[in-house]
Amino acid sequence: IDRFDESAILIGGRRNERLVGSLRILCREPEEEWEHDRFWSWRDEFPPRRSTVDVSRLCLEWDERRIQSVVCLLRAVGYVMLELRRRFILACCTDELVGMYSTFLGARFTGDVILHEDLGAKPHRMFFVDLDQILGGRGPSLLGWLEHVRLLRRVLCATMKSEFGMRYRTVLCSYLLRAQQRG
């Protein structure tokens, strides 16, 4: 827990009523401090801050570390980004996860490596993901993930703080219900 949690959108994944994974979305104004600002500088060639969310603290229980669990959490990120009208994800990962994020999300790595003391001693690589490319069929297919909404509904539990958070909990539930009714 840190100073960013108060304004964060927290996403949790459950299996059989047990929390097995979580992540955090920060939707900040360009002039506000972002979590990753402490470790590197935003450059002109990066996507605009106004169009980006900062996703961090993705954590899964050891026995849940499989692609289905990650996909369920990232589906929720996609839903939130659509509601927020943000196109890009800014995130970081260890070397072991570079292939997964490249393959399944079309992650574009910046070449920057940071040491984030809150995330342990391993170096983390910074990357962006373009949701518009995924939804537009010009990258990995998020639509394939969205076909599994029943699984998502069972596994996903959005846990958010404050009045701001309650609004987005309702948004996530609304997306899930609408998708289920169409499916």
What are these regions (language model features)?
Residues 1-5:
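Short loop/turn motifs at secondary-structure junctions and domain boundaries
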Residues 7-9:
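Short loop/turn microsegments at loop-to-beta-strand junctions
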Residues 12, 17-28:
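Conserved beta-strand in the GNAT
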Residues 20, 30-32, 134-136:
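Short, acidic Gly/Pro/Ser/Thr-rich loop/turn segments
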Residues 33-133:
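Acyl-donor binding region in acyl/amide transferases
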Residues 121-183:
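Charge-rich, low-complexity intrinsically disordered segments
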